[in-house]
């Protein structure tokens, strides 16, 4: 391609990225603000809502079966389109995944929101690209939408950009999409913030110097354990989804029956502490409040069980919660500042579980500031190496 043609095509993609960023940012603001309100309502009234989790599961399943069964594939469908294995994403996926996630959270399921935002962005950008007969490469449009979805919801445009270009193919950066993805992520973040969706950020007060042997070894241990935790999450989620699908093949039966013990355990153990996104645990970790030694493990178990039986929602915010709570505990055991270790865990467990490297480092920069960037790089690189190409997105292409 000649330089002039390349510049013209790039400008077309950037214009589309701006359009996608505005629309997806607005949808993210709606989705995120409603989800926050729902979460606050559930926290107050969980004893009346959790018993109806099985019924909510049946309603979610019925919605998909009636309106768009193909949309049940969720992120799998996004990856199939990105890897040219499929060429269609139903627009109905957007309202279905939003409503399904709201219901999951309202009635106490343990799940996230990032996967939902990414699906929203990818679906919209893919539809616009097809509608406008957009040139040549549908994958770039998909990456633009994924970056907008992530960036609009979390307002971390750098990590959103690198997440989107890293995640489609393991070990391969989609640099062709870099500038358009960056534009869509920044526009989406600006739009959602302008519409009242707040960004989460924390100033880390205590840091460490990598001067002593003990400190260096402790940081390496952190990276290894965070990496193993992300790997455990990804491996367990994949295996449990397969097991549930093979053991109880009827989706209505699977979600209706298995949600009964899920709701009971969520109710009994610390009164819905492990329901929802896990932002309560994240807030406690960075506020110096009570973090139990088993918080990270129970949040992991409840999240993979919720998602494996068919409820809707993402994985990333629970991963942030798992990393934060594990970091607090490990910080105390290793003699390192707990808040700093919580921040490192927040980023590194996410990176390991999603099998991304640059995205979690950028999360560290955008959420916690640049003062500890060297530590974030070291811990995230180690966690990424420990992971071994296992991802929550089983369809990532190696």
Which sequence ranges carry the predicted segments?
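Alpha-helical transmembrane segments and immediately membrane-proximal extracytoplasmic
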Residues: 1-398
């Amino acid at each position: 391609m000649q330089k002039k043609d390349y510049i013209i095509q790039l400008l077309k993609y950037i214009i589309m990225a701006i359009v996608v960023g505005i629309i997806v940012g607005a949808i993210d603001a709606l989705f995120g603000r409603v989800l926050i309100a729902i979460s606050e309502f559930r926290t107050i009234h969980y004893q009346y809502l959790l018993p109806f989790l099985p019924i909510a599961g049946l309603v979610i399943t019925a919605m998909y079966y009636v309106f768009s069964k193909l949309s049940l594939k969720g992120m799998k469908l996004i990856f199939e389109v990105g890897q040219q294995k499929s060429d269609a994403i139903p627009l109905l996926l957007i309202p279905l995944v939003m409503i399904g996630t709201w219901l999951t959270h309202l009635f106490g399921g343990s799940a996230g929101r990032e996967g939902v935002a990414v699906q929203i962005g990818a679906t919209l950008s893919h539809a616009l690209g097809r509608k406008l007969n957009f040139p040549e490469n549908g994958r770039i449009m998909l990456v633009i939408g994924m970056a907008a979805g992530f960036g609009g919801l979390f307002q971390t445009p750098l990590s959103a950009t690198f997440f989107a270009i890293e995640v489609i193919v393991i070990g391969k950066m989609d640099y062709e999409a870099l500038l358009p993805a960056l534009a869509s992520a920044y526009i989406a973040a600006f739009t959602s913030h302008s519409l009242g969706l707040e960004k989460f950020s924390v100033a880390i007060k205590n840091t460490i110097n990598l001067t002593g042997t003990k400190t260096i070894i402790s940081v390496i241990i952190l990276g290894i354990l965070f990496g193993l935790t992300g790997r455990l999450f990804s491996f367990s989620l994949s295996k449990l989804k397969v097991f549930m699908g093979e053991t109880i093949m009827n989706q209505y039966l699977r979600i209706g029956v298995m949600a009964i013990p899920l709701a009971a355990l969520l109710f009994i153990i610390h009164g819905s502490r492990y329901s929802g996104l896990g932002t309560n645990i994240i807030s406690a970790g960075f506020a110096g409040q009570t973090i139990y030694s088993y918080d990270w493990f129970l949040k992991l178990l409840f999240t993979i069980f919720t998602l494996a039986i068919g409820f809707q929602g993402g994985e990333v915010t629970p991963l942030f919660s798992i990393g934060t709570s594990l970091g607090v505990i490990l910080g105390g055991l290793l003699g390192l500042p707990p808040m700093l270790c919580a921040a490192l865990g927040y980023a590194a467990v996410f990176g390991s579980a999603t099998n991304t490297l640059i995205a979690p480092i950028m999360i560290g920069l955008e959420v916690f500031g640049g003062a500890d960037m060297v530590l974030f790089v070291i811990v995230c690189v180690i966690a990424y190496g420990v992971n071994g190409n296992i991802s929550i997105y089983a369809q990532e292409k190696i």
